[in-house]
């Protein structure tokens, strides 16, 4: 059975940078290792300005990750390693790449991607964008879970494939979400970029836009999408997919 290639092991921090850890951060490092998150955070914040900034932000990222705060973890990592937003991600220590690109339901993603004939790395990128692997996240309009499924959509797919519709269950959500994405791919004749766009903007909108420009090359069509959020969404999911493909091999 395939195992999660992003399983994380805490490194000896002396091995992830050329210079040694500043002495004012060593206590924070030890406190984080002991899961004393409150005191560790206070130590880091107290010494942040006078310490090595990337080290401090990286320690904060580990602290927030350990305490389940993915938003602050992401912000801290981006400060520590600005190259996370570029194509130079290979220069980021593997431990932090694994933190930035989590996969918490690897086996389910592989299983249901294969069942639906989908690229699992694309599904990893989509889940990252939709929920950052938080199975309980809910949008203001009611989209729920890892793949942010709307209740009517989830119920319709669940009825058709004889599945539970409990979208807060990670495996159920992935099963329903990958099935729904397969539907979108089929609807657009195998055009995955259009399926990604419709996952964000709705299939009705994308069908209407494509019918208005049926022969426009795909790259030009994607740039002409009238919703800025959807244009950026397609680019973001595509980039995340490529990142997951690269770091899991």
Predicted feature locations:
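Primarily a LysM-type cell-wall glycan-binding module
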Residues: 21
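Short Lys/Arg-enriched alpha/beta "domain-start" segment
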Residues: 16, 33-34
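Active-site-adjacent segment of 2-oxoglutarate/Fe(II) JmjC oxygenases
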Residues: 30
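Catalytic glycan-binding domains that act on GlcNAc-containing polysaccharides
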Residues: 1-18, 27, 39-249
């Amino acid at each position: 059975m395939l195992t999660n290639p992003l399983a994380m092991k805490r490194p000896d921090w002396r091995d992830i940078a050329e210079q040694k850890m500043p002495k004012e951060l060593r206590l924070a490092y030890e406190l984080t290792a002991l899961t004393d998150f409150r005191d560790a955070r206070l130590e880091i914040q107290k010494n942040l300005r006078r310490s090595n900034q990337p080290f401090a932000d990286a320690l904060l990222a580990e602290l927030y990750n350990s305490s389940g705060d993915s938003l602050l973890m992401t912000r801290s990592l981006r400060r520590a390693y600005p190259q996370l937003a570029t194509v130079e991600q290979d220069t980021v220590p593997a431990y932090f790449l694994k933190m930035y690109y989590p996969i918490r339901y690897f086996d389910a993603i592989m299983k249901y991607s294969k069942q639906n004939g989908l690229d699992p790395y694309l599904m990893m990128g989509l889940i990252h964008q939709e929920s950052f692997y938080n199975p309980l996240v809910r949008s203001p309009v009611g989209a729920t879970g890892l793949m942010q499924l709307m209740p009517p959509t989830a119920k319709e797919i669940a009825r058709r494939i004889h599945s539970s519709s409990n979208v807060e269950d990670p495996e159920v959500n992935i099963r329903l979400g990958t099935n729904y994405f397969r539907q979108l791919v089929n609807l657009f004749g195998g055009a995955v970029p259009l399926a990604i766009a419709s996952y964000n903007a709705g299939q009705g909108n994308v069908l209407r836009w494509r019918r208005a420009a049926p022969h426009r090359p795909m790259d030009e069509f994607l740039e002409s999408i009238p919703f800025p959020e959807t244009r950026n969404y397609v680019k973001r999911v595509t980039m995340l997919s490529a990142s997951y493909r690269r770091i899991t091999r």
